[in-house]
C-alpha cells in the first residue's frame, strides 16, 4: 500500500541503475518527513550510465556514496569512482564474508555448495539473515559508520548501496 507523500515508494528511474529510491517524503519522527533528494538507496553503481552518474552528482548534489558490499564484490564490479568527481566514497562491508542469497562475489556454484552444507531448513536460513547482518560485528561497524557519515554530512545527498539495493541497503 502506498505511503501518503511518498509516491511509488520513492522510485527514481535511471538507465543503468536499478532499484534506486529517494527516501524524501517518507514519514519521520514527530510527524515530519525526510527531505527530498538527500537520502538515496540503490543497487550497485557498476552498470550506471554516464548520464545516470551525471544526474546523481549534479541534480542530487551527491556528496557521498556508502558501499555495503564485500571486498570481493567491489573487486568484481567496482563503483565508477573516476566518473564521480567530488564525491567521497566509503567502503563499509556489512558482512564479514559471503552470504548465500545476498552477496554476489563467489558465484552460483559456491552458493550451491554453501546452501548444501547448511544444516537447517531454507526457511531458517532466510529468517536468520537479517539479524545476522545487523548483529554481526561487520554489520554493527558498517551501519554505525554509515549513520555517523550521515550525521556529519555537509548538506549534500548521500547514496548507499549493496549489489541489488534490497537486503544490506534496505536495512540501511
Regions found by a protein language model. Give the residues of each.
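Ser/Thr-glycine-rich phosphate-binding loops at phosphate-binding pockets of nucleotides
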Residues: 163-169
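Cys-dependent protein tyrosine phosphatase-like superfamily
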Residues: 1-159, 172
Amino acid at each position: 500500500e502506498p505511503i501518503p507523500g511518498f509516491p511509488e515508494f520513492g522510485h527514481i528511474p535511471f538507465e543503468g541503475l536499478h532499484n534506486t529510491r529517494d527516501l524524501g517524503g517518507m514519514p519521520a519522527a514527530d510527524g515530519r518527513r525526510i527531505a527530498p533528494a538527500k537520502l538515496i538507496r540503490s543497487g550497485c553503481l557498476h552498470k550506471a550510465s554516464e548520464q545516470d552518474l551525471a544526474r546523481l552528482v549534479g541534480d542530487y548534489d551527491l556528496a557521498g556514496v556508502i558501499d555495503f558490499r564485500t571486498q570481493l564484490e567491489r573487486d568484481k564490479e567496482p563503483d565508477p569512482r573516476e566518473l564521480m568527481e567530488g564525491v567521497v566514497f566509503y567502503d563499509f562491508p556489512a558482512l564479514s564474508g559471503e552470504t548465500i542469497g545476498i552477496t554476489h562475489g563467489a558465484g552460483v556454484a559456491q552458493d550451491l555448495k554453501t546452501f548444501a552444507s547448511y544444516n537447517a531448513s531454507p526457511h531458517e536460513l532466510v529468517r536468520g539473515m537479517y539479524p545476522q547482518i545487523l548483529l554481526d560485528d561487520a554489520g554493527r561497524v558498517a551501519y554505525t559508520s554509515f549513520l555517523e557519515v550521515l550525521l556529519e554530512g555537509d548538506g549534500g545527498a548521500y547514496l548507499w548501496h549493496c549489489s541489488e539495493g534490497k537486503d544490506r541497503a534496505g536495512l540501511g
